[in-house]
């Protein structure tokens, strides 16, 4: 397989490099005098020998890889000019298996020129200044790359130029040894061992929940049925992972649904509410209250609440609005850019999967972070272990939401920033999308209703499945620490999502499917598992699912939240037309199974049954969480920060100094420079502009 390297040298300096130099000097106290960068691509062509591939790319490089006015490309060693004589060189590229949008776009561009090749991208950063190795490594890992998802290498000048990087090209490949036989998880163990199983597998299940699962598989009727199916008595890893995903805090909102025994002390000066049992914050105080208000006040504009991927409200006589907001905190703490990008694209997908598919028309966000300068104020060693430092979270999260909206053609129309020290442990990344939904389709169906039918084919459309996104649902229920799983972090692909979105809305108007939902935090487990409740059962074959690379196990295929994926119920007679439209629009579509009325979620890998879960147990078997709440009066807020870590800036000698200090606080200072990076004009429908223009 031929692999060649192409480098793109900018002819115009970028402001980003100047910004990184300022950050290194201001926040890291490192005198980085100048930095330049070069984008590089590794191009792998299975159908071509190396000289032939070099010739092809040499003729077409200006069409795909660079703008000849602002940059130039090279396929062989060349004079580095402005990049000469750096102190250190940093190479940053995505780890194998991590979504590489730049490389993917380049591969798509080559395909348009009838060149079949895989492309991986990366960057070279040339650091100039009186730096030592430790300082160069600090700049590399704090400002240029993220070890969680990227390979970051720091070379001295001599080391870098000693290697002929154009002749020794290795294309990044994921190498996994597939274990296609499911693993049996024996639950006939002690309580301590049950808790350890949950911890080791990142299931986020409590001991009570593990025992409920254990008792289910000890049931004689269950054992009898499983024996006839040639399944082990105890759950397979596929079954246990599906249960953990379905019962996760992310999907079931167990704390919101918990029964609460409330009591209080008789505190003078405060009104007593009295001891009471609350059936759950969600059920009693949110859902029931909403239903009661809807009935008592005749709120006929509430079309769908608490039952779909987003709420649906009536806008006028022909259009309904869909609204969805969601947090994406834990992934954004580990990989700020990827976590936030995944978050905003996720709520876009929720809108696409609402009813029979709505069109996203606006994004919104609220960010709560620790103050950006906290690391400099208290020292990095005093920050919580696990999350990135606050400034990197702010910059990465903002860029992720910016790219998610701008590159998908969805305007960001409102939002907020808030800063407080306690968000150093876990930021709040609150993202939302508004969608427009026609009330009727051309065939007369109500667009707000989903009606999957038995015998409908199960199609998976959009992105392929990878290891990124595994345990996204359960991971978000756990405390962040240095052992948080890297596979729970993924990077979205706005290009694939845009194509999938346009295709889906076209298929909707042609009446090609009966129901749709997104592949949320549990991938096929959540989408097929939820849609199966409409018909009473489903059967799928995981071996039919497209993969980013070979070697994924059945449970990984089932629960991975690969981005830009939807599950669609297609009537049998519409299958060929659905596939033809997908091919014409450049969208991957795979027929992986069928909905039925059997009462089970049956999962195969080829001819082997790897999981068979009763839908009633899967969706209704979760034991209710019981909590006790006691109010014993107001408490003084305590800080996790050690005394003296943050300088007291009070006692300014002049009003001017005090005012300047006040106006520079992160919650008061202008956010205009951040907000203006959002595209709020795309789709040409934003009437009230930011900052009055």
What are these regions (language model features)?
Residues 1-11, 37-44, 84-96, 121-126, ...:
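Short glycine-/aliphatic-rich beta-strand segments at the starts of folded cytosolic domains
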Residues 7-16, 48, 91-102, 129-132, ...:
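Short, surface-exposed ligand-recognition loops at beta-strand->loop->(often short) alpha-helix junctions
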Residues 12-29, 57-58, 98-114, 529, ...:
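Short amphipathic alpha-helix segments
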Residues 19-82:
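Acidic (E/D-rich), amphipathic helical modules within compact regulatory domains
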Residues 25-31, 59-69, 110-116, 138-151, ...:
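A common structural junction motif
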Residues 46-51, 129-136, 569-576:
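Helix N-cap motif at beta-to-alpha junctions
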Residues 63, 67-119:
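Short, solvent-exposed interaction modules
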Residues 97, 117, 122, 128, ...:
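Glycine/proline-enriched, intrinsically flexible loops and inter-domain linkers
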């Amino acid at each position: 397989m031929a692999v060649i390297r192409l480098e793109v040298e900018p002819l115009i300096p970028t402001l980003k490099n100047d910004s990184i130099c300022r950050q290194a000097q201001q926040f890291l106290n490192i005198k980085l005098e100048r930095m330049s960068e070069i984008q590089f691509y590794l191009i792998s062509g299975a159908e071509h020998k190396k000289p032939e591939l070099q010739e092809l790319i040499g003729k077409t490089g200006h069409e795909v890889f660079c703008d000849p006015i602002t940059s130039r490309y090279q396929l062989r060693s060349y004079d580095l000019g402005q990049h000469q004589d750096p102190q250190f060189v940093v190479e940053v590229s995505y780890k194998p298996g991590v979504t590489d949008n730049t490389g993917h776009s380049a591969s798509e561009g080559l395909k348009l020129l009838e060149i079949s090749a895989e492309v991986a991208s990366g960057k070279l950063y040339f650091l100039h200044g009186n730096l030592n190795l430790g300082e160069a490594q600090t700049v590399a890992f704090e400002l240029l790359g993220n070890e969680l998802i990227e390979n970051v290498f720091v070379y001295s000048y001599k080391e870098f130029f000693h290697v002929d990087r154009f002749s020794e090209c290795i294309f990044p490949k994921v190498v996994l040894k597939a274990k296609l036989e499911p693993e049996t998880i024996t639950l006939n163990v002690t309580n301590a061992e049950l808790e350890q199983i949950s911890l080791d597998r990142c299931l986020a299940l409590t001991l009570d929940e593990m025992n409920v699962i254990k008792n289910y598989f000890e049931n004689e009727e269950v054992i009898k049925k499983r024996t006839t199916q040639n399944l082990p008595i105890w759950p397979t890893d596929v079954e246990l992972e599906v249960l953990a995903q379905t019962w996760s805090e992310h999907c079931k909102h167990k704390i919101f649904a918990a029964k609460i025994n409330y009591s209080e002390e008789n505190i003078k000066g405060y009104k007593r509410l009295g001891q009471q049992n609350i059936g759950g914050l969600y059920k009693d105080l949110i859902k029931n209250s909403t239903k009661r208000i809807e009935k008592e006040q005749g709120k006929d504009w509430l079309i769908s609440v608490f039952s779909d991927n987003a709420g649906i409200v009536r806008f006028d006589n022909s259009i309904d609005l869909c609204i969805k907001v969601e947090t994406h905190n834990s992934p954004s703490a580990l990989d700020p850019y990827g976590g936030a990008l995944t978050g905003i694209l996720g709520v876009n997908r929720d809108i696409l999967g609402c009813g029979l598919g709505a069109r996203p028309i606006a994004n919104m966000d609220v960010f709560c972070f620790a103050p950006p300068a906290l690391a400099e104020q208290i020292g990095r060693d005093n920050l919580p272990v696990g999350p990135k430092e606050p400034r990197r979270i702010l910059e990465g999260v903002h860029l992720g939401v910016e790219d998610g909206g701008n590159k998908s053609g969805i305007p960001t129309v409102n939002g907020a920033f808030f800063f407080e020290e306690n968000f150093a442990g876990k930021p709040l990344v609150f993202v939302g999308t508004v969608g427009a939904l026609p009330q009727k389709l051309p065939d007369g169906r109500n667009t707000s209703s989903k009606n999957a039918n038995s015998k409908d084919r199960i199609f998976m459309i959009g992105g392929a499945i990878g290891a990124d996104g595994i345990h996204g649902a359960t991971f978000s229920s756990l405390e962040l620490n240095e052992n948080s799983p890297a596979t729970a972090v993924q990077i979205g692909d706005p290009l694939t999502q845009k194509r999938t979105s346009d295709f889906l809305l076209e298929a909707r108007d042609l009446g090609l499917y009966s129901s749709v939902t997104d592949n949320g935090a549990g991938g096929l487990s959540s989408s097929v598992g939820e849609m199966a409740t409409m018909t009473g059962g489903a059967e799928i074959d995981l071996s039919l699912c497209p993969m980013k690379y070979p070697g994924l196990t059945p449970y990984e295929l089932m629960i991975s939240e690969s981005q830009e994926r939807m599950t669609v119920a297609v009537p049998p007679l519409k299958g060929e037309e659905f596939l033809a439209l997908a091919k014409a629009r450049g969208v991957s579509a795979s027929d992986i199974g069928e909905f039925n009325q059997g009462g089970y979620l049956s999962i195969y890998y080829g001819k082997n049954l790897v999981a068979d879960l009763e839908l009633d147990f899967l969706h209704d078997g979760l034991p209710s969480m019981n909590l006790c709440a006691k109010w014993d009066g107001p408490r003084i807020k305590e800080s996790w920060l050690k005394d003296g870590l943050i300088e007291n800036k009070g006692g300014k000698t002049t009003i001017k100094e005090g005012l300047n200090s006040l106006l520079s606080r992160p919650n008061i200072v202008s956010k205009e420079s951040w907000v203006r990076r959002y595209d709020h004009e795309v789709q040409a429908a934003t009437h009230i502009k930011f900052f009055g223009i």
